[in-house]
C-alpha cells in the first residue's frame, strides 16, 4: 500500500442507530467528537444515525410514523394567507 495517500483519521468508527439500538463498526474518516463503549468493551468514535437499514421502512417492511412535521407543510403553514392577498 502506498504511504501518504490515506487520510490521517481513517479508523474504526461505531455507526449507531439509536431508534433500534443497533450499531456497526466500520473503518471510516467520519468526523465526530463523541465516543461510546461497544459490546466488546472497547471505546470507539461514535457516529449517530437517524435511520439505517435496520430501521428504515423500505428494508424492514414495517410502517413507521414520522414524529416531525415535514418542510413542505411548515412552509405551507407559514405562508397560507399569502395566496388570498395576491388573487384579484
From Swiss-Prot:
The keyword Ribonucleoprotein applies. Keywords: Ribonucleoprotein, Ribosomal protein. InterPro entries: Ribosomal_bL28/bL31-like_sf, Ribosomal_bL31, Ribosomal_bL31_B, Ribosomal_bL31_sf. This is Large ribosomal subunit protein bL31B. GO terms for biological process: translation. Part of the 50S ribosomal subunit. The gene is rpmE2. It comes from the Bacteria. GO terms for molecular function: structural constituent of ribosome. Disulfide bonds: none annotated. SUPFAM superfamilies: L28p-like. The lineage of its organism: Bacteria, Pseudomonadati, Pseudomonadota, Gammaproteobacteria, Pasteurellales. Pfam families: Ribosomal_L31. GO terms for cellular component: ribonucleoprotein complex; ribosome. It comes from Glaesserella parasuis serovar 5 (strain SH0165).
Amino acid at each position: 500500500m502506498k504511504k501518504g495517500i490515506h487520510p490521517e483519521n481513517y479508523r474504526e468508527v461505531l455507526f449507531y442507530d439509536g431508534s433500534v439500538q443497533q450499531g456497526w463498526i466500520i473503518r471510516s474518516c467520519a468526523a465526530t467528537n463523541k465516543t461510546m463503549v461497544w459490546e466488546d468493551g472497547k471505546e470507539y468514535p461514535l457516529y449517530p444515525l437517524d435511520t439505517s437499514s435496520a430501521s428504515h421502512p423500505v428494508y424492514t417492511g414495517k410502517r413507521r410514523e414520522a414524529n416531525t412535521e415535514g418542510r413542505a407543510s411548515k412552509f405551507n403553514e407559514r405562508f397560507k394567507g399569502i395566496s388570498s392577498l395576491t388573487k384579484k
